[in-house]
């Protein structure tokens, strides 16, 4: 959640940045009206309180005590009434603020959508083939690695069954990713895939993205859309010691998304599924540590791709493509020969203190004061999309898939 004091004190500057993130101008106008109303009602409340304090002190020496008591009683009623008005406005303001995204960093390019993201660099060269490379779903069906028909039969569209070496390769990737991330200093944790609403709120999924979540009927439980949610919230409501930071964690999980806005996109294959697997990185840091830790996380995910021999590129997301909780995001896109283009395989984001304010994660700084931490997250990596990338990049003209050297010991 945004710092409402900063929003109020720097309204024009902050709302300009929010507009670049495509926040509805009507919401921003409503915020301005609420701030003005709140200021007016708080001023009135302070005047009533000042009256009460002043004349309460004079009551003992007043000549007409009964008259003054009556005035104080009447004024107390006004204080109660005015306090209610202020509370109603504050609650309305906070409710609107819950649906307002994070402010983009200064370094984030201003743009409308993904077409205005900025390429930072390319890593490794895409492979060349003396034949037309196939897409992963063609390879997967011919090798009996991917069973889309039975996936749909037992579930619905956008579900798939992994079989034989395809399932083994997926499991090998999970183990390799966890080991790689641990070698970079990330502690392995295993968390629930079902979390409560407060946890979903803490990382920013609720209330704004409620319709894209799978919820358990009659219970305050949701299937996670990323393990960023439970890992970050492990420390919700806590005050950490300065010495423990940064906390760097990695986690494997299944992820569940309705993909409500993806009709017609990636309808074939396993690029976009309702259930998929991911190995995540999450860090909790002091504010002054978050930029360097962001670079560590980005380097970890990029080096992991390189260790598998997968060509990829770094993209800085523009304001219009930036996620709700993120202040800055760099995507990693892997080269897919079958599609002849780069596709997203990881997003590394710095959320600054946005999630920490919602989840109430603080630490005691060197001055002994409680301060909000910074939270960061990133995929290292999306398992299904890495499987896709290996299938397409390591295919031969006979339609066989060769296993990258780094993974051979995991079979």
UniProtKB/Swiss-Prot annotation:
User: A single GO BP annotation from the record?
Assistant: seryl-tRNA aminoacylation
GO MF: ATP binding; serine-tRNA ligase activity
The protein's annotated catalytic reaction(s) are: tRNA(Ser) + L-serine + ATP = L-seryl-tRNA(Ser) + AMP + diphosphate + H(+); tRNA(Sec) + L-serine + ATP = L-seryl-tRNA(Sec) + AMP + diphosphate + H(+)
Q: Which residues bind ATP?
A: 257-259, 344-347
Q: Which InterPro entries match?
A: aa-tRNA-synt_IIb, aa-tRNA-synth_II, aa-tRNA-synth_II/BPL/LPL, Ser-tRNA-ligase_type_1, Ser-tRNA-synth_1_N, SerRS_1_N_sf, SerRS_core, tRNA-bd_arm
> What are its GO cellular component terms?
cytoplasm
Q: Which organism is it from?
A: Campylobacter jejuni subsp. doylei (strain ATCC BAA-1458 / RM4099 / 269.97)
Q: So what does this one do?
A: Catalyzes the attachment of serine to tRNA(Ser). Is also able to aminoacylate tRNA(Sec) with serine, to form the misacylated tRNA L-seryl-tRNA(Sec), which will be further converted into selenocysteinyl-tRNA(Sec).
Q: In which pathway does it act?
A: Aminoacyl-tRNA biosynthesis; selenocysteinyl-tRNA(Sec) biosynthesis; L-seryl-tRNA(Sec) from L-serine and tRNA(Sec): step 1/1
Q: Which protein is depicted?
A: Serine--tRNA ligase
Where does the record say this protein resides?
Answer: Cytoplasm
Keywords attached to this entry? Aminoacyl-tRNA synthetase, ATP-binding, Cytoplasm, Ligase, Nucleotide-binding, Protein biosynthesis
Taxonomic path: Bacteria, Pseudomonadati, Campylobacterota, Epsilonproteobacteria, Campylobacterales
Subunit record text: Homodimer. The tRNA molecule binds across the dimer.
Note on domains (UniProt): Consists of two distinct domains, a catalytic core and a N-terminal extension that is involved in tRNA binding.
The record's section on Gene3D superfamilies has: Bira Bifunctional Protein, Domain 2 (3.30.930.10), Serine-tRNA synthetase, tRNA binding domain (1.10.287.40)
Positions of L-serine binding: 226-228, 280, 379
So what family is this one in? Belongs to the class-II aminoacyl-tRNA synthetase family. Type-1 seryl-tRNA synthetase subfamily.
SUPFAM superfamilies in the record: Class II aaRS and biotin synthetases, tRNA-binding arm
> What does the record give as EC number?
6.1.1.11
Q: Name one Pfam family in it.
A: tRNA-synt_2b
Q: Could you name the domain of life of the organism this protein comes from?
A: Bacteria
Report the principal subcellular site: cytoplasm
């Amino acid at each position: 959640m945004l710092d409402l004091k900063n929003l109020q004190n720097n309204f024009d500057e902050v709302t300009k940045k929010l507009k670049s993130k495509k926040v509805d101008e009507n919401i921003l106008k409503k915020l301005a009206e609420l701030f003005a109303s709140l200021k007016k009602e708080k001023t009135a409340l302070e005047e009533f309180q000042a009256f009460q304090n002043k004349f309460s002190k004079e009551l003992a020496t007043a000549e007409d005590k009964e008259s003054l008591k009556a005035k104080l009683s009447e004024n107390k009623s006004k204080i109660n009434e005015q306090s209610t008005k202020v509370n109603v406005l504050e609650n309305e303001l906070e409710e609107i603020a819950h649906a307002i995204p994070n402010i983009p960093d200064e370094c984030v390019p201003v743009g409308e959508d993904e077409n205005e993201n900025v390429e930072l660099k390319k890593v490794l060269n895409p492979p060349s083939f003396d034949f037309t490379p196939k897409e992963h779903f063609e390879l997967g069906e011919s090798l009996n690695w991917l069973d889309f028909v039975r996936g749909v039969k037992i579930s619905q569209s956008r579900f798939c069954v992994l079989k034989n070496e395809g399932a083994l390769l997926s499991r090998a990737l999970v183990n390799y990713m966890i080991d790689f991330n641990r070698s970079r200093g990330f502690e392995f944790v295993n968390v629930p895939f079902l979390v409560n609403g407060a946890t979903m709120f803490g990382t920013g999924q609720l209330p704004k993205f409620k319709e894209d979540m799978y919820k358990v009927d009659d219970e305050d439980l949701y299937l996670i859309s990323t393990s960023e949610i439970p890992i970050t919230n492990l420390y919700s409501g806590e005050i950490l010691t300065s010495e423990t930071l940064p906390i760097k964690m990695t986690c494997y999980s299944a992820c569940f998304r309705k993909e409500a806005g993806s009709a017609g996109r990636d309808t074939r294959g396993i690029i976009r599924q309702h259930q998929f697997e991911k190995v995540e990185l999450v860090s909790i840091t002091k504010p002054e540590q978050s930029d360097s830790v962001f670079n560590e996380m980005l380097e970890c995910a990029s080096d992991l791709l390189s260790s598998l021999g997968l060509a990829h590129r770094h993209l800085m997301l523009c304001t219009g493509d930036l996620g709700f909780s993120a202040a800055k995001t760099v995507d990693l896109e892997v080269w897919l020969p079958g599609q002849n283009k780069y596709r997203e395989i990881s997003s590394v984001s710095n959320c600054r203190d946005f999630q920490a304010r919602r989840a109430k994660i603080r630490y005691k700084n060197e001055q002994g004061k409680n301060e909000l931490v910074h939270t960061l997250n990133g995929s290292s990596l999306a398992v299904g999309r890495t499987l896709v990338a290996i299938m397409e990049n390591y295919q031969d003209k006979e339609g066989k898939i060769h296993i990258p050297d780094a993974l051979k010991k995991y079979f």
